[in-house]
Amino acid sequence: MTTRIAIDCMGGDHGPSVTVPAAIQFLAEHPSANLVLVGQEGVLRPLLGNHANDSRIRLLHASEIVGMDESPALALRNKKDSSMRVAINQVKAGDADACVSAGNTGALMAISRFVLKMLPGIDRPAICAPLPTVNGHTHMLDLGANVDCGPHHLLQFGIMGAMLVAAMEHKDQPTVGILNIGEEEIKGNEVVKAAAELLRASDLNFIGNVEGDGIYKGEADVIVCDGFVGNVALKTSEGLAQMLASSLRSEFKRNWLTKLAALIAISVLNNFKKRFDHRRYNGAILLGLKGISVKSHGSADILAFGNAISRAYDAAENRVVERISSRIAAMIPAAVENV
């Protein structure tokens, strides 16, 4: 069966000038996939050029656009023909296996939750994305959907993250850690300590507390935290990476000797840049819904948005929603009863 991805082509800082070329490039790399390109047809069709007749592409007109600064509540209530809403509706109707948007994060969360609904046993959706580590990458959630969480929410995040990694990376027992201010069990606030007890009592491969530096050491396949902590950690890391890159460029441009050193080290520098290029990790999945909804960075370029499409495709191909649903049904009652 062909996997079909619906794309909100009007969302993001760059809109169709990025989303349409990224879609074309994705199809070149995934010849068996199909795409539904959602947006203003008069804008999208010229950008497709000869690809407008590609049988793997279906154009679906949507007259409205959700602004990047628009109120999520107003977007949900008033813009029922937005490209974001129509793309999500495709998943709900079974006409697409996943959707991708670079649009307003709050609106995507609100509309996805309203249209797709939550999986039984899951109280809240969580934003999950991969982060680079010294030996590969880790998955971290929540990255901003839920500022305040109870222990049972963090347990649910752990289950969802573990099932995502198990499905997409084919790991039987992915390791799960909880982000904390120390490795000892006595460390942390009451919510984190209670959540650790729930995770420890579950049948997840829980390794205990992970400190902030452990994120990038690759100490766990999945790292659980509330959305406030996760978002701060993510944005701090992005800012640090930008500062280091800027400082490195400045140092190599300082004089003729440092410029020569840069030329000698250029292959090493390019490999380093590629390894930690945030565009490679673009595409955060909203876990916990009865369908796959993927959030791309609003500022994504063609490479980054293409990776978000690929992430949605891989999640659909590996039946992530079904894996989470079956594991939640089996684990949640037992996990809670054992504490």
Curated annotation (Swiss-Prot):
Gene3D superfamilies: Isopropylmalate Dehydrogenase. It is found in: Cytoplasm. InterPro entries: FA_synthesis, Phospholipid_synth_PlsX-like. One of its GO terms (molecular function) is phosphate:acyl-[acyl carrier protein] acyltransferase activity. The keyword Lipid biosynthesis applies. One of its GO terms (biological process) is fatty acid biosynthetic process. Its EC number is 2.3.1.274. Transmembrane segments: none annotated. Pfam families: FA_synthesis. Keywords: Cytoplasm, Lipid biosynthesis, Lipid metabolism, Phospholipid biosynthesis, Phospholipid metabolism, Transferase. Belongs to the PlsX family. Catalyzes the reversible formation of acyl-phosphate (acyl-PO(4)) from acyl-[acyl-carrier-protein] (acyl-ACP). This enzyme utilizes acyl-ACP as fatty acyl donor, but not acyl-CoA. Homodimer. Probably interacts with PlsY. This is Phosphate acyltransferase. It comes from Dechloromonas aromatica (strain RCB).
